[in-house]
From Swiss-Prot:
Zn(2+) binds at C40, C43, C54, C57. Its EC number is 2.3.1.310. Heterotetramer composed of two BbsA subunits and two BbsB subunits. BbsA forms homodimeric subcomplexes. Both BbsA and BbsB are essential for enzymatic activity. This is Benzoylsuccinyl-CoA thiolase subunit BbsA. Signal peptide: none annotated.
Length: 144
């Protein structure tokens, strides 16, 4: 008689969330959330996200700099076929901030409504659902 093995479910890997405290600060006092830039204490280069060591001088000490909440849409793409957990259609874009940084982010609003050079502002919202259908919250930008 052959030995029967119990049906074992494969272990579920933990889901990856897009929210990370090194990227986004939501102040407890109710002030508006902001993205965190990192300025190298050695050479002054500002980056988002944090790049360690500093790509300019190899410095390893940084200060957190709150980034502007507003910027200009440099480029964007409307997506009609998405990855698992993302409701289609949706848009992504590159946003130029006054600090001379270019940020990649999901855009909040109807695809087809965006134009290059649109003024946009930081917001927080659902970027997708995890495998369990739980919304994952992170930063996005929307037209002003």
């Amino acid at each position: 008689m052959s030995e029967q093995k119990p049906n074992k479910k494969p272990e579920k890997k933990p889901d990856i969330t897009f929210f990370h405290p090194d990227l986004l600060e939501a102040p407890a006092d109710g002030r508006a959330p902001y993205l965190k830039g990192y300025r190298c204490k050695k050479c002054g280069q500002l980056d988002f996200p944090k790049l360690s060591p500093c790509p300019s001088c190899w410095g390893e000490e940084f200060e957190v700099v709150p980034l502007s909440r507003r910027g200009k849409l440099y480029s964007f793409s409307d997506n009609f076929i998405g990855q698992a957990g993302m409701k289609t259609p949706y848009s992504f874009g590159y946003i130029d901030l006054p600090e001379n940084l270019r940020i990649f982010a999901q855009l909040e609003g109807a695809p087809g409504s965006f134009r290059c050079d649109d003024e946009v502002e930081l917001t927080v919202g659902t970027v997708r659902d995890n495998r369990d259908g739980v919304p994952l919250i992170s930063y996005k930008f929307r037209k002003i």
